Amino acid sequence: MQQTTVANHSLFPTLPPEFLPLALYTVAATVLIGVLLLAAWWLGAKTTNRNKELPYESGVIPTGSARLAYPVPFYLIAIFFIVFDVEAAFIFAWATAWRELGLAGLIHITFFIVILLLGLVWLWMKGGLDWGPSRERR
């Protein structure tokens, strides 16, 4: 009688045992999120009325529409902040590793800063940084 061996076929490939804590953590986090979402749905309010659909205005009853247009300069300042905040993050990352990067890293970050400064000068010349009463007089 000949014995045949059946290969161990699994849906999941064999993973090293070091991944077991990560897998358990992932499963536990997913289950916890599911339980919390289910509890919020189950315990949450089921009724809706006109007052629940209004935006919260610190207890003051709203008198007009909440959909007001913001002036464009606020949007521009927010975009400028994001651009230069990302620049600061890149420069900080470069500064933490400047010894390892050497001269090549210095050349790259200098090029990066020059490009951003040229963009800032162009923006300034186009009037993108002018807002308020002085811009309205032009």
Swiss-Prot record:
User: Which InterPro entries does the record match to this protein?
Assistant: NAD(P)H_OxRDtase_bac/plastid (IPR023043), NADH_UbQ/plastoQ_OxRdtase_su3 (IPR000440), NDAH_ubi_oxred_su3_sf (IPR038430)
Localization per record: Cell inner membrane
Q: Which GO-annotated molecular functions does the record name? A: NADH dehydrogenase (ubiquinone) activity; NADH:ubiquinone reductase (non-electrogenic) activity; quinone binding
The keyword rRNA-binding is annotated on this UniProt entry: no
A Pfam family annotated for this UniProt entry: Oxidored_q4
Q: Where are the transmembrane segments?
A: 19-39, 74-94, 103-123
**Could you state one GO cellular component term attached to this entry?**
NADH dehydrogenase complex
Coarsely, its chief localization is membrane
Entry EC number(s): 7.1.1.-
As its record notes, the protein acts as a catalyst of:
a quinone + NADH + 5 H(+)(in) = a quinol + NAD(+) + 4 H(+)(out)
Protein's membrane topology: Multi-pass membrane protein
Translocase listed as a keyword: yes
Q: Which UniProt keywords apply?
A: Cell inner membrane, Cell membrane, Membrane, NAD, Quinone, Translocase, Transmembrane, Transmembrane helix, Transport, Ubiquinone
Family note: Belongs to the complex I subunit 3 family.
PANTHER family hit by this protein: NADH-QUINONE OXIDOREDUCTASE SUBUNIT A (PTHR11058:SF21), NADH-UBIQUINONE OXIDOREDUCTASE CHAIN 3 (PTHR11058)
> What is known about what this protein does?
NDH-1 shuttles electrons from NADH, via FMN and iron-sulfur (Fe-S) centers, to quinones in the respiratory chain. The immediate electron acceptor for the enzyme in this species is believed to be ubiquinone. Couples the redox reaction to proton translocation (for every two electrons transferred, four hydrogen ions are translocated across the cytoplasmic membrane), and thus conserves the redox energy in a proton gradient.
Q: How does it assemble?
A: NDH-1 is composed of 14 different subunits. Subunits NuoA, H, J, K, L, M, N constitute the membrane sector of the complex.
From the Swiss-Prot or TrEMBL record, give the protein name.
NADH-quinone oxidoreductase subunit A 1
Q: Which organism is it from?
A: Geobacter metallireducens (strain ATCC 53774 / DSM 7210 / GS-15)
